């Protein structure tokens, strides 16, 4: 999965898919009442990027729906996975459940079209703080209450705070999550970070005893880091330059070992070599 980083406008979505992304990461900011408000990152952000792109969340969802609905004039067949980077740091811990509820209602109406031929992409809810795990509970219970529990088949999870993996596992136990787990690891492209935690996450994924199904590394912009990430056997690379990821995947060392995921690849299934 080649995950276009910080895609917060519909024009950027077209741009990143055009460069080779089959997945995008979108930042979601919340208002004081825990309503998802804008797709917006703000300052500071990755080096070499403009931090200010912003779209009303529901408008973004409508555009995303068109981009992921076969037959629509705006349809991108390649775009199969969306990571919502939920900026819940602005919320009190006790608002996490409400944020999950409101997020589910927004997605149900504007992305899934109330279950009537909505967008087909898989969705990852990426939460920065472990103690906001009730967002997951609120999200799930809302879809169940609305009669659309089936849509949870399209939803996965990530905690993005680089916490200890055993703590992440405990938090998922509390949230009642048993699958559909991606584990992120990374840092802004302005700084360097080693691969030790990525390797620990991959080991958890491959042990058959852990909760992790997939691992992605962010933000990977350099050719050398891209190769290191692939050598560590990650499932996803989040990048500002998807064309570089495509270029490296075409190198002799990688083209027989890796391929770009399609809609037929289940993002919640651990790949077995």
From Swiss-Prot:
It is found in: Secreted. One of its GO terms (biological process) is killing of cells of another organism. It is an enzyme of class 4 (lyase). Its EC number is 4.6.1.-. One of its GO terms (molecular function) is toxin activity. SUPFAM superfamilies: PLC-like phosphodiesterases (SSF51695). Mg(2+) binds at residues 25, 27, 85. GO terms for cellular component: extracellular region. Its cofactor is Mg(2+). It holds the Pfam family GDPD_2. The active site is at residues 5, 41. It catalyses: an N-(acyl)-sphingosylphosphocholine = an N-(acyl)-sphingosyl-1,3-cyclic phosphate + choline; an N-(acyl)-sphingosylphosphoethanolamine = an N-(acyl)-sphingosyl-1,3-cyclic phosphate + ethanolamine; a 1-acyl-sn-glycero-3-phosphocholine = a 1-acyl-sn-glycero-2,3-cyclic phosphate + choline; a 1-acyl-sn-glycero-3-phosphoethanolamine = a 1-acyl-sn-glycero-2,3-cyclic phosphate + ethanolamine. Expressed by the venom gland. Keywords: Cytolysis, Dermonecrotic toxin, Disulfide bond, Hemolysis, Lipid degradation, Lipid metabolism, Lyase, Magnesium, Metal-binding, Secreted, Toxin. Disulfide bonds join 45-51, 47-190. The keyword Lipid metabolism applies. Binds 1 Mg(2+) ion per subunit. The keyword Lyase applies. Belongs to the arthropod phospholipase D family. Class II subfamily. Dermonecrotic toxins cleave the phosphodiester linkage between the phosphate and headgroup of certain phospholipids (sphingolipid and lysolipid substrates), forming an alcohol (often choline) and a cyclic phosphate. This toxin acts on sphingomyelin (SM). It may also act on ceramide phosphoethanolamine (CPE), lysophosphatidylcholine (LPC) and lysophosphatidylethanolamine (LPE), but not on lysophosphatidylserine (LPS), and lysophosphatidylglycerol (LPG). It acts by transphosphatidylation, releasing exclusively cyclic phosphate products as second products. This is Dermonecrotic toxin LvSicTox-alphaIC1ai. It comes from Loxosceles variegata.
């Amino acid at each position: 999965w080649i995950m276009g980083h910080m895609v917060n406008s519909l024009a950027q979505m077209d741009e990143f898919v055009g460069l080779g992304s089959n997945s995008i990461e979108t930042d979601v900011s919340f208002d004081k009442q825990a309503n998802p408000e804008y797709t917006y990152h703000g300052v500071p952000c990755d080096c070499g990027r403009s931090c200010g792109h912003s779209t009303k969340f529901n408008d973004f969802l409508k555009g995303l729906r068109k981009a992921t609905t076969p037959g629509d004039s705006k349809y991108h067949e390649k775009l199969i996975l969306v990571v919502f980077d939920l900026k819940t740091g602005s919320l009190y811990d006790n608002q996490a459940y409400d944020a999950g509820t409101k997020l589910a209602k927004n997605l149900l109406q504007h992305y899934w079209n109330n279950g009537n031929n909505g967008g087909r992409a898989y969705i990852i809810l990426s939460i920065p703080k472990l103690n906001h795990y009730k967002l997951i509970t609120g999200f799930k219970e809302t879809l169940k209450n609305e009669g659309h529990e089936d849509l949870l088949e399209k939803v996965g999870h990530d905690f993005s705070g680089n916490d200890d993996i055993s703590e992440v596992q405990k938090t998922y136990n509390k949230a009642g999550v048993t699958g559909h787990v991606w584990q992120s690891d990374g840092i802004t492209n302005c700084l360097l970070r080693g691969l030790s935690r990525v390797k620990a996450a991959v080991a958890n994924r491959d042990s058959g005893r852990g909760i992790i199904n997939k691992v992605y590394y962010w933000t990977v912009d350099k050719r050398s880091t891209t190769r290191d990430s692939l050598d560590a056997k990650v499932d996803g690379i989040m990048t500002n330059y998807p064309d570089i990821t495509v270029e490296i995947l075409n190198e002799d060392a990688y083209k027989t070992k890796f391929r770009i995921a399609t809609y037929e690849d289940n993002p919640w299934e651990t790949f077995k070599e």
